[in-house]
C-alpha cells in the first residue's frame, strides 16, 4: 500500500533452480589382505566414495551400490541347509560380516541399487535369495588350489560380460540356484556355476571367480561403477536458489 492509500505491486523475485549432485557412495566389506586387489579399481574411479563396513558403520540408506567380496565360509546359522559335516567349513567364519552383508543385500535390493558380488559374495547373494551351496568341492580345496589357478568357462550368449578363462579359487559353490536368478557362465570342466545375474533387476551380477585380480576384467568394473554413478544421479534434486 502506497502513502496515498493505493495498492502497489510487489517486486518480482525470480528463483533459479540448480541441480545438486552428491558424490556416489559404494558400500562394501573387504578383508585387509584383499584391499590391495581392489585399490587400483577404486583409484580409477575417484569420484565414488568407498564406504567400508569393516572399518566403521555404513548408512545403507545413503548407499548407491553394494560390492560383496571374497572371504571365509558363510556362518552356518545363515545357511538354508543342513550341515552334515561341520569339519568342511572354515573355522574362522566372520559372523559380524555375515550379519552386515545379509542385511545390506536386503536393503539394497528393495531400493534397486546396483550390486556386484565376488567369490564368497556370490555365495552370500545366492543364499540371501533362497539358494543353497555345495559346501565342499572335491579338488577345489584351498590346500589343493592356488590363487593363480585358471578355469575355462562356458558362457551364455546373453551374458553382457563373457570371459574364456577366469581366475577362480574356491572350495564352495552354488548348488541350488536362488529363484529369480539366471546362470551366465559355468566352469567348462566341471559345470560349477561361475556367474549369475538377477532377472528383472537393473544390475545385480555375481561371479565365483576373482575379477579384481586381472586387468582383463576392467570393463566389468567400469560397467558396475557407471551403474553406481547413474543411480546416484537419478536421485538428484533441483532446489530453488
Sequence positions of predicted segments:
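Active-site-proximal beta-strand elements of phosphoester/diester hydrolases
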Residues: 204-209
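N-terminal beta1-alpha1 cap of cysteine-dependent amidohydrolase-like domains
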Residues: 1-120, 126-134, 138-159, 163-165, ...
Amino acid at each position: 500500500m502506497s502513502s496515498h492509500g493505493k495498492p502497489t505491486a510487489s517486486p518480482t523475485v525470480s528463483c533459479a533452480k540448480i541441480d545438486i549432485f552428491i558424490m556416489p557412495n559404494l558400500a562394501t566389506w573387504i578383508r585387509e589382505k584383499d584391499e590391495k586387489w581392489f585399490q587400483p579399481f577404486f583409484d580409477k574411479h575417484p569420484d565414488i566414495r568407498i564406504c567400508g563396513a569393516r572399518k566403521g558403520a555404513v548408512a545403507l540408506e545413503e548407499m548407491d551400490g553394494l560390492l560383496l567380496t571374497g572371504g571365509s565360509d558363510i556362518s552356518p546359522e545363515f545357511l538354508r541347509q543342513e550341515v552334515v559335516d561341520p569339519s568342511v567349513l572354515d573355522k574362522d567364519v566372520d559372523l559380524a560380516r555375515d550379519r552386515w552383508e545379509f542385511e545390506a543385500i536386503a536393503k539394497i535390493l528393495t531400493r534397486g541399487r546396483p550390486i556386484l558380488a565376488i567369490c564368497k559374495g556370490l555365495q552370500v547373494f545366492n543364499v540371501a535369495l533362497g539358494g543353497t551351496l555345495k559346501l565342499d568341492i572335491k579338488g577345489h580345496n584351498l590346500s589343493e588350489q592356488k590363487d593363480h589357478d585358471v578355469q575355462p568357462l562356458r558362457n551364455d550368449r546373453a551374458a553382457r560380460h563373457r570371459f574364456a578363462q577366469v581366475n577362480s579359487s574356491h572350495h564352495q559353490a552354488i548348488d541350488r540356484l536362488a529363484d529369480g536368478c539366471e546362470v551366465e557362465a559355468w566352469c567348462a570342466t566341471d559345470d560349477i556355476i561361475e556367474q549369475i545375474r538377477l532377472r528383472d533387476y537393473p544390475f545385480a551380477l555375481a561371479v565365483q571367480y576373482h575379477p579384481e585380480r586381472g586387468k582383463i576384467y576392467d570393463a566389468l568394473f567400469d560397467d558396475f561403477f557407471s551403474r553406481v554413478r547413474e543411480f546416484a544421479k537419478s536421485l538428484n534434486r533441483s532446489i530453488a536458489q
